[in-house]
Amino acid sequence: MNNLILVKYASEIFLKGLNKNKFERKLKENIRKKLKDIDHEFITDQNRWFIKSEDLDGVIERVKKVFGVKELCLVTQVEGDFDSIKEEGLKKIKESKAKSFKVETNRANKKFPMNSMEVSRAVGGYILSELGDEIEVDIHNPECKLYVEIRGNAYVFTDKDKIKAVGGLPYGMNGSTMVMLSGGIDSPVAAYLMARRGVETHCVYYHSHPYTSERAKDKVKELAKIVGRYTEKITLYVVPFTEIQMDIIEKCREDELTIIMRRFMMRVACELSERKKIQSITTGESIGQVASQTMEGLMVSNDVSDRPVFRPLIAMDKEDIMDIARDIDTYETSILPYEDCCTIFVPKHPKTKPRVKDMIIAERKLDIEALVNKAIDEMETFIFE
């Protein structure tokens, strides 16, 4: 008998038709990268994936964070005969100390002499005969579900042996995006959600030294590292933004400051994406959450983008976003009290319904191309693996 980890990938991958093999290969590649310093063996048994290792806890901790993996199951491998299956099933039920149970069988090996229903009945009957009045069958609400997978070998486990994973699609299968990362709660969640859909994720942070401290920058670097735990690696570009902000403050109306700054952030992200061959922009904006995130404000920001702008949080409540932040371990870092460039120089009464034509007129006073290029030329680059 061997204890193995059964890897179940997202059902969405099954629907990829002729591209299914590409997604499977990428997912296997990503799993192997996560386990590069853990001794392990990858086993395929009739289209099921298993991992064998002396460090099962270490494997579980890493693989459950691989995008595309839906669930992990700690299974016991036995010989593919009924006697071995029933004995291991009895052992699992005894260990569970449950008062009721149900058996579910998946017989992929069609050479096995019993079908799935017959195996479930026979294993259940054997357990009842051995445990007598200690336990009963409950097919609707059992305390313990016993699962039997019959392939080349047989694999037995219970619902207590299941570990939920992150799901999604294999990282790197769906293009690339530049996430406008701040030190807040929202943008790290947006980065995570895009990565979860298989999008290669890069980040840009706008740093307003000396108005924002080095601790604010360190906070954003830490957020990028946390998101990077779910990806192969993550790159953070730190762009100096003070000169742009001061020029806007000097030459533009106060109520237009926020939206013009947002337009410059979008321009910088687009130009940086062009240089790095990144296909899209992602922000952590949610409709109506703050004054600049009205429908009109978002349209005015989009106006300066030359590529798709994704907003994965657009219809989410703040509480929902905070829940995800807690789940992915960014929340405690995000709430550290260090200001970013979005929280300084905020006008008392920002425009909530800006118009593109008004912004174009206001920006004529600014040397847009020179400001954008200078900021990018002076940026810092950090790579976290």
Curated annotation (Swiss-Prot):
GO terms for biological process: thiamine biosynthetic process; thiamine diphosphate biosynthetic process; thiazole biosynthetic process; tRNA 4-thiouridine biosynthesis. It comes from the Bacteria. InterPro entries: Rossmann-like_a/b/a_fold, ThiI_AANH, ThiI_fer, ThiI_N, THUMP_dom, THUMP_ThiI, tRNA_STrfase, tRNA_sulfurtransferase_ThiI. Pathway: Cofactor biosynthesis; thiamine diphosphate biosynthesis. The keyword Ribonucleoprotein does not apply. GO terms for cellular component: cytosol. Residues 57-160 form the THUMP domain. CDD domains: PPase_ThiI, THUMP_ThiI. Keywords: ATP-binding, Cytoplasm, Nucleotide-binding, RNA-binding, Thiamine biosynthesis, Transferase, tRNA-binding. Belongs to the ThiI family. PANTHER family: TRNA SULFURTRANSFERASE (PTHR43209:SF1). Catalyzes the ATP-dependent transfer of a sulfur to tRNA to produce 4-thiouridine in position 8 of tRNAs, which functions as a near-UV photosensor. Also catalyzes the transfer of sulfur to the sulfur carrier protein ThiS, forming ThiS-thiocarboxylate. This is a step in the synthesis of thiazole, in the thiamine biosynthesis pathway. The sulfur is donated as persulfide by IscS. This is Probable tRNA sulfurtransferase. It comes from Clostridium perfringens (strain ATCC 13124 / DSM 756 / JCM 1290 / NCIMB 6125 / NCTC 8237 / Type A).
